[in-house]
Amino acid sequence: MRRSKAEQKQETIQTLIQTARTQFSELGYAATPLEKLVSDAGMTRGALYHHFGNKEGLFLAVLQSVQQEIAVRIESEASGSDDLWEQLILGCRAFMAAAVADNNRRILLIDGPSVLGWDVWRRTDEQHAMMTLRDQLQIMQTQGILKHASVDALTHLLSGAMNEAVLWIAESSERQQALEESVAAITLLCEGFRAD
């Protein structure tokens, strides 16, 4: 059965994103030659330009894909508990572990902000992991689990703390230990928001 044009288009987009993700995570954005990328994807430069405009547009699509996968992982791992407090901590752990994974670290932490600029990188974060965090905190506050405070302020505070923690974890020679220490520290921080 022949694929529709829409299916062919989606397949082309996904092939370019997956090929670029592999190369960007291994080589970095700057060191990834466009010719090799499109060749490895079995595409032409024209296909890349048609769907993404340029290499930076493709990188943005890769970053959004990484952010979406991390948000799904957060929700999946947090749903392992019915307890809202435990869900928050599980979600924080999932974010930090996913952010420092070998296939995400360079794209998310290094090239994301430098290639796209802080504002664009921040917006993609707000549309994915931060949104998941904000939703969880809002539910917890509505149910009286958190002290009364601005959910937006709490979201930015926790997100900033975790973003800084993942930079530290990524540079650590003992990543697993650094992850555990960061989860313990985030848990202590969150305890300060817990209603009595």
Predicted regions and their residues:
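Amphipathic alpha-helical packing segments from all-alpha helical-bundle domains
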Residues: 68-71, 118-143, 152-156, 180
